[in-house]
Design a protein with these regions (language model features):
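Bacterial signal peptide processing site
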Residues: 43-46
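Extended C-terminal subregions enriched in glycine
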Residues: 395, 415, 536-539, 577-627
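Active-site rim segments in enzyme catalytic domains, especially the processed small/beta chain
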Residues: 143-150, 154-160, 166-167, 319-322, ...
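Noncatalytic scaffold domains of N-terminal-nucleophile
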Residues: 69-118, 122, 130-294, 299-301, ...
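C-terminal motif of bacterial Sec signal peptides marking the signal peptidase cleavage site
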Residues: 38-41
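Bacterial N-terminal signal peptides that target proteins for export
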Residues: 3-31
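Short, small/polar residue-rich loop motifs at catalytic or cofactor-binding pockets
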Residues: 333, 474-477, 541-543
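Internal maturation/activation junctions in enzymes
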Residues: 86-87, 371-495, 624
Length: 658
């Protein structure tokens, strides 16, 4: 594999570097080991952030686990918008924080927050499995990333070892009593944002805890109660509010409306708590002690369930969630959605998650796209700031493939328990004959807006309408990537929906607003929308955990977690096609199209790219595309297998391991 120099933000964008691991040995020999890293050119083997390491090499902890600080991504987060496309607002970016990159020959976890990574590493050191570490980390993320995920939300988890690849669906479900008109007024008009995203109305049945319990029963090693200890300790002792969390608290227009949330996130005089303030959560610690002793049942059928239902029903914007809804919830094992691309096998989540299928479609299109193959290694160039970006032609082809995949997503993707797959099989959307048909739509000029395709023997193309909410931004989310001592891996993504979810707080954690993940408009010109709201249904989800294998083997090559398919697809392309390390690929500018305007990450791309796309007919928008990617990549050093870990420089994530 040939790795290219890692992109660096321009000096005006470079901010504080996350501290590296404990006294570390440097992997200066990576270049000589055949990774071909151009260390001097861009400062490091592990992309932006390797600048604080000698010769840019990754740091490996000399002790059993890395001790990482709580330094967050520098720069204030932007104020969340007061209105939302599709009822949902994008999670704001929070600047750029160079990440040093981490590596380990044994075990490692990369998490969206350093304290969560520490918790996971503690469990790995104690002999825990990848699933054990993911559970411990998620319990801490509920505490340290309350804007992005928690026990009150939903999650997706992929697991792989040398024998099996498994998918676990912990997405929320709609309360039984809701109707498809939940977000419409009496005249059929859409309700405003305050009635859509805040309060009890948008709350679905949380699924994260049941999913974690299901995965632990299958692949846990340590006792369930042991996994709760790091989060309980942190909730009791407190943790300093990160700059990112502080900025999001200060900017949220709805959070202070709930008395419990107001008491937790704001001072007595009403001022939002600031960065560095010690935040203790005794209510959450008590909840965790109850769950550690009793499993998930108290959450779904006991005292916690009663309090959740009461909170939702008695809020100023009441919802329909009941104790019975909670008691009926089931996390589901599913079959991963896998496909081959060149020398890799890419596996993601199946519907109602959309990321696995979108990536399979995009890379299936790349595989048969002559213009993509002709580009060879000429898909990246350096911009004036010294960073890497795609060439206009590469960005054009990537965006058009995404446009086609998202057209099908808007037409077909929904809860498979309620909505049939085209011709009864989701694989029809990646069949060679179907992709060959779709390839004919990609030309020298952008499609602008692509129409959904018609798989063979499918009548659904005329049965369902197009989802007007399909361009809603992806949810706020937290991600994990874990490898344990046995080589088993976990990729996980979890979310509350919007930042801070419904803004309702109960028992020390926030509840989701997952019902905004459905289409608010149930019909399109009289035709039902596949992702319309219905009681007991799971919303379509953009959460995208992904695992890549060396083709034809059980050998894991790459583990990724992301909130949306497009940044994950960019990262996969960076590794599989463009010769980058996972850190370099994550740090590339975010770009692509979800079948709307072609979006480019503002401040990270050149005028040459913008104009090149416009000449190809693209409507280009420069937007502050945040992402929350985490990744693990297997490489070889002196004949030894080594894991490289990295977190998105746009967020405060970190890695820890031994």
């Amino acid at each position: 594999m040939t790795d290219r120099p890692s992109p660096r933000p321009s000096p005006s964008r470079r901010q504080a570097t996350l501290p590296a691991a404990n006294p570390a040995r440097r992997l200066a020999s990576l270049a000589a080991a055949g990774l071909g890293l151009a260390l001097a050119a861009c400062g490091g083997a592990n992309g932006p952030g390797a600048g604080n390491a000698a010769a840019g090499a990754a740091a490996v902890s000399a002790s059993s686990s890395a001790t990482l600080g709580t330094t967050a991504a520098s720069g204030a987060a932007q104020r969340p918008p007061q209105t939302a496309f599709g009822g949902r607002v994008a999670e704001p970016a929070s600047g750029w924080s160079d990440k040093p990159g981490w590596s380990s020959a044994r075990s490692m976890i990369v998490a969206a927050n350093p304290l969560a990574a520490q918790a996971g590493a503690e469990i790995l050191k104690a002999g825990g499995s990848a699933v054990d570490a993911a559970i411990a980390a998620q319990l801490v993320l509920t505490l340290t990333e309350p804007q992005s995920s928690g026990l009150g939300g939903g999650a997706l988890l992929l697991y792989a070892d040398d024998k099996t690849t498994e998918a676990y669906d912990g997405l929320e479900t709609a309360p039984a009593a809701v109707s498809e008109r939940l977000f419409l007024d009496r005249d059929g008009k859409l309700l405003g944002p305050a009635q859509t995203v805040a309060g009890g109305r948008p709350v679905g049945v949380p699924g994260t805890l049941r999913m974690l319990e299901l995965a632990h029963r299958a692949h846990g090693k340590l006792p369930w109660k042991r996994l709760f200890q790091p989060a309980i300790k942190l909730a009791d002792q407190g943790f300093p509010i990160s700059p990112r969390l502080a900025a999001l608290i200060a900017g949220d227009p709805y959070l202070r409306a709930d008395p419990a949330a107001r008491a937790y996130f704001y001072e007595q005089d009403g001022r939002p708590k600031t960065a560095g303030t010690l935040l203790r959560n005794p209510a959450y610690a008590a909840t965790l002690r109850q769950l550690a002793a009793g499993g998930a049942n108290p959450f779904y059928s006991g005292a916690i369930a009663r309090e959740i239902a009461a909170k939702v029903g008695q809020s100023a914007n009441p919802g329909l969630l009941t104790q019975q809804d909670l008691g009926r919830y089931r996390a589901l094992p599913r079959t991963p959605f896998c496909g081959d691309y060149r020398k890799w096998t890419l596996c993601g989540m199946p519907p109602p998650a959309s990321g696995g299928l979108a990536i399979a479609q995009m890379f299936g299109l790349f595989d048969g796209l002559p213009d993509w193959q002709k580009l060879g290694g000429q898909k990246l160039v350096r911009n004036d700031g010294g960073g890497l970006e795609p060439t206009p032609q590469a960005a054009h082809l990537f965006s058009e493939a995404g446009r086609l995949a998202y057209a099908d997503r808007a037409r077909y993707l929904a809860d498979p328990e309620r909505v049939p797959a085209p011709a009864g099989d989701w694989q029809r959307l990646v069949a060679p004959t179907y992709l060959a048909q779709r390839l004919q739509r990609i030309g020298d000029t952008s499609l602008g807006h692509a129409e959904a395709g018609v798989p063979a023997d499918s009548t659904l193309a005329t049965s369902f309408g197009d989802d007007p909410d399909a361009l809603a931004p992806p949810p706020a989310a937290s991600e994990l990537a874990v490898v344990d001592h046995d080589g088993a891996v976990v990729a996980m993504a979890s979310s509350l929906g919007d930042p801070f979810g419904s803004r309702l707080m109960v028992r020390g954690f926030l509840l989701n607003d997952a019902l905004t993940g459905f289409s608010r408009t149930p019909r399109d010109h009289g035709r039902p929308i596949a992702n319309r709201l219905d009681g007991g249904k799971r919303p379509r989800s953009s959460l995208t955990p992904e695992i890549a294998f060396e083709r034809g083997t059980r050998r894991v090559a790459l583990v990724l977690g992301g909130a949306d398919a497009m940044p994950v697809a960019k990262t996969l392309a960076g590794v599989t096609d463009w010769g980058l390390t996972v850190a370099q690929a994550i740090a590339l500018p975010n770009f692509g199209s979800r079948n709307g305007p072609t979006e480019l990450e503002a401040g990270r791309v050149s005028d040459t790219l913008v104009e090149g796309l416009r000449r190809r007919g693209h409507e280009v928008r420069l937007v502050p595309i945040t992402s929350d990617l985490v990744g693990l990549q297997r490489v070889a050093l002196d004949g030894q297998s080594l894991w490289l870990g990295t977190a998105d420089p746009r967020r405060e994530g970190a890695a820890a391991g031994d």
